[in-house]
Amino acid sequence: EKVIGNGEKGYFEADKFTFSKPKGIITLINNVYMKSGDTELRTPDKAVMFMNENKFVSANATVKKGNDTLKGDTITAFFKDTKRFEIDRAFSNGHTEIRSEGKKAFADRGEYEAKTGLVKLFDNVKIIDASGYTATADIGIYSSTKKTFTLQNNVKVKDKSGYTAVAKNGIYDLNNKTFTLLNNVRIDKGSNVITAPKAIYFQQKDEFRFYDDVKVTQDGNTATALSGVYFIKKNIAELEHNVVITKDGNVVRGDKAISDFNTSKSRLVAKKGGRI
């Protein structure tokens, strides 16, 4: 028979428990489940509640809030009070995992704050998307309210199509399905390289849009422009506005260029009413 406890706005259960009144410690043992509002915590192992500190420590725990899930080898949670079982802050050590909207994020440790709805991930941060790309960074911040993953420092994206993208920072918007790369953006596909200060990946269109001084480097030639689009499935980039192609010291200018990543060559194309 399970042990069941009810707080003012919370609930817990476990297979059995022990209680040390002098130390103010309750140990819930096996198949632990706690609930407060839309937040649930589960662990198949034991969980230790330090009543005097409003603290809860558990191994192999899973915290679920709405559609978001946080897992950790060891989770230390602090309650607002022991009557509500409402989590105020939580820390995860060891293998840490977040699941939300088809995304999986991993790290070696994490921090959660209920007030801001932010989960901060540290050390070996990795995001795996169901569409086939993987993003890594030094630091990751997930906002449960905005539904965004912010990646900081040494951002790197690898896709099953074969390209690699790097930047200093990145923001993945789960609602709009966009991934914005900022500062020193570089995309490599074979011998082709695209650089720009800013790029946005549109997941539904499967394309990157580049802004502010785009540069494509290929075998023996470079092409620059104010903006551009890389069509991943077609494996070509289209550059527009103040296009300049340089090859073997020769320079040509125009309004639009196509950089073919299959042949590693760029060419100017005429727009209606445009110029070459």
Language model features: what each stretch is:
Residues 1-276:
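Mature-chain termini and adjacent capping regions
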